[in-house]
């Protein structure tokens, strides 16, 4: 039988030679372990990084939430809750920071107006480049 174990952020897969790697069941099992590893890393890193950036740039938010949405990297509610996709952990650190600054900026402007864009640019001058780069990645696992 196959076995999949997670140690920290390393996923070990052991399968007999005859295992059908393309089977839906096997793929789902692997996906579940990847999500578990991403969630563990995200829980450790993302709230601390968000807090650091908020303090550095004088933003405030009410709470944080980790998600695993399929189409969004993050969001900010009208009550100031910032949701962060665990798949952010698949990205380079500069793109993670861009997404977090983007969401923090929504605590001041709940839209994508010119004022919002200017605020993001103030704290991340490369935001256009990073926004473009982000399109090459997917929050899906």
Positions of predicted regions on the chain:
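Walker B beta-strand of ABC/ABC-like P-loop ATPase nucleotide-binding domains
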Residues: 100
């Amino acid at each position: 039988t196959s076995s999949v174990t997670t140690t920290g952020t390393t996923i070990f897969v052991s399968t007999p030679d005859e295992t059908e790697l393309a089977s839906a069941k096997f793929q789902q099992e692997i996906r579940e372990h990847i999500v578990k590893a991403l969630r563990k890393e995200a829980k450790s890193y993302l709230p601390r990084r968000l807090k650091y950036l908020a303090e550095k740039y004088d933003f405030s938010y009410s709470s944080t939430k980790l998600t695993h949405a399929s189409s969004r990297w993050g969001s900010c509610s009208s009550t100031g809750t910032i949701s962060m996709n665990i798949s952010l952990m698949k990205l380079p650190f500069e793109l993670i920071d861009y997404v977090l600054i983007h969401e923090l900026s929504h605590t001041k402007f709940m839209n994508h107006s010119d004022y919002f864009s200017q605020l993001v640019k103030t704290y991340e001058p490369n935001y256009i480049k990073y926004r473009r780069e982000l399109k090459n990645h997917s929050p899906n696992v």
